[in-house]
Amino acid sequence: MLFRSLACEPLKNKKKPRVLVGGLGMGFTLKAAIDTLSAGAEVVVAELNPIVVKWCRGPIACLTGGVVDDPRVKVVVADVAAVIRRAALPGRGNRFDAIILDLYEGPYEGDRGRGAYLYGDAAIERSCAALKAGGVFAVWSEEPDKAFEKRLKAARFSVNRQRPGRGGRHAVYIARKTPGPQARES
């Protein structure tokens, strides 16, 4: 089963799931989410590059059936970390049932590297705060990363690592927000 399907599978029976997809790319992750989720779903896609959005609405729209124009989809040209930060603010009613990060750079950068703003301790805690109870935090990674798994568990996620596809080189983390007080919010 592909990462895209694994990420939304826990939400397939939810009537109105709210999902954040980090990165549009060619639209395949978005397409899989839309195909898995109910008609009442809302999928917010955060894409940094407006040209990518233009391509997905134009020359490569046929690859995904024009999924970016599905009425359940809202595309924002923004950094996914900023969208997560806003959703994590106390008192906000815009938390997500799932956050899916299918980005070029995965968590292998560690807590202090370039990816810390998405995969470091504080970022993971923000993602947890941006999720509803039982929410899913799904992350694609170039390879397994034990330190990332440890950071997920420290933020009170239950973690399921999969190795989908041929060869099993890449890792997919499906982390569920567990009940109870979460780690400190930043």
What is each PLM-predicted segment?
Residues M1:
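S-adenosyl-L-methionine
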Residues G135:
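Glycine-centered, phosphate/nucleic-acid-interacting loop/turn motifs that mediate DNA/RNA or nucleotide
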Residues R4-L131, V139-E142, A155, N160-G168, ...:
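The AdoMet/dcAdoMet-binding core of the Class I SAM-like
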Residues A147:
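Conserved active-site alpha-helix within GNAT-family acetyltransferase domains
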